[in-house]
Structure formats: structure tokens, C-alpha cells
Amino acid sequence: MKRLLIIAHAPSPNIQRMIDAVLKGANSDEIDGVEAIFIPALEANADDVLKADALILGTPENLGYMSGALKDFFDRNYYPCMDKTEAMPCAILIRAGNDGTGTRRALESILTGLRWKIVQEPLICRGDFKEEFIGQAEELGLFMAASLEAGII
């Protein structure tokens, strides 16, 4: 069974709802052969990444940057993953109170260094929280799981 790993920092109930929606989409009844799991950014490690076939990375925008928790994940795991996870398919989910540009740029820079492959346009949910963010997050989870199941990624 293939594994889709969601690594995220969800400090607010709304962001947690978005992560839950990603999991709901990824674990849809339409998908067989893919296990989707969530590990908080402060708990995830290189072994978790090495067991995964694809990743979704989620973060709020904090002062125009990713959360400290997701940055900590990369600080701890960048070099242990560097040469063992080249071309890892991944997607980005950003909950941005502003525009998310700085957060996206920082994540893309790190992912480029790791040589991971962003396989979906980053989902940046901007401005005040809207219920439509939940549906968008669920679609992201479904897309990643279906793509993994089909061998597209």
C-alpha cells in the first residue's frame, strides 16, 4: 500500500479543519491502495518521510513565512532526507491571512534544495477564513491520493 504523509502545523481550529479535510479527501472511498496519515510538524521526522510515497506540507502564514513548527521540521530533517528522497512528490497547503507569497517562496526554495517535486499548484487560502477552504483542502487530498494510486506521481 502506498503512503501519503501530511506534515503540517495546525495551531488553530480552522487550520485543523483544513488538515482533517485533506485527510478526508485522501481517504475517500474512491481510493484504494493509498494510506493517508497526518503527523504534526513538530513530531514528524526523516524516518516518516522515508516511509512515504508522497507528501502534503501544510502551514499557516506567520509574518510572511511558514510556521516555526514546519521550519523546525525542515531544520531537523533536511540533511537526513537530502540524498534519500530525491523527486519526492509533494504539494503545499498555506493558510494565509495575507497573500502567502513569502511562505510559498520559502517552501519552494527548501523543496528545490531537497530536489522534491511539487506536483500540484500550491493551495493558498487567502484572507479571512471561508468555508470553501475546506472543500479546496479536501480536493487537494483526493487529487494527491488518486494521483499516487494511479502511478501518476
Predicted regions mapped to residue ranges:
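A short beta-strand-loop structural module common to alpha/beta enzyme folds
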Residues: D32-E43
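N-terminal beta1-alpha1 ligand-phosphate binding loop
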Residues: K2-N27
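Residues that form or flank phosphate/diphosphate-binding pockets in enzymes
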Residues: P13-R17, Y65, T101-G102, E132
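Glycine-rich phosphate/pyrophosphate-binding loop and the adjoining helix
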Residues: N27-E30, N45, K117-I153
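Short histidine/acidic/glycine/proline-rich micro-motifs that form metal-
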Residues: A10-P13, I94-D99, I124-K130
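Conserved beta-strand termini and adjacent loop/short-helix elements that scaffold enzyme active sites
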Residues: I7, I39-A41, E121
